[in-house]
């Protein structure tokens, strides 16, 4: 995966740490979702066996799942064909008083193929791109959402978040109208 670092402090050591952290984070999610192999970070942010016995606890320990569910919904609502693995901002801050102690999905930055084509009733965020799209534009499937979209506990979280948003639809529409 390729990520752009948006920070004023990016020494070579920091860039290497961030690259390693993101590789390990994705591996942790993959291992938990696909292989039922539960890992965690040690003090040096290396992966080690975890004491967790399920995928949900393993991933929730290191990712802000509410933010992931929110981002999933944004890409699903927009039918974004370009959801890719990095079409949104993510952050994590390991400082003592951090607002983002877990990997947090913040906001999208790239909607170059939103609302592409006719709605087909399929999932967009957690699905592989349609072969005809891939043939022309390349595969822009989102591996984070594909892995998590296969987890019932995550989809329950997404459904709950969607239900909550529907209850507050008036506030959403008012915000849109204000813009």
Write out the residue ranges for each language-model feature:
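ATP-dependent phospho-/nucleotidyl transfer catalytic cores
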Residues: 1-78
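Generic, well-ordered alpha-helical scaffold segments in large soluble proteins
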Residues: 21-28, 32, 71, 75, ...
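Surface-exposed patches in mature extracellular/periplasmic domains of secreted proteins
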Residues: 35-39, 80, 88, 171-175
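Short, surface-exposed, charged/polar-biased interaction segments
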Residues: 39, 43, 86-90, 179
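Secondary-structure capping and boundary motifs in well-ordered enzyme cores
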Residues: 61-69, 80, 97-103, 137-140, ...
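Catalytic activation segment of kinase domains across protein kinase-like and atypical kinase folds
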Residues: 84-140
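Hydrophobic, secondary-structure "cap" segments at the distal end of domains
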Residues: 115-179
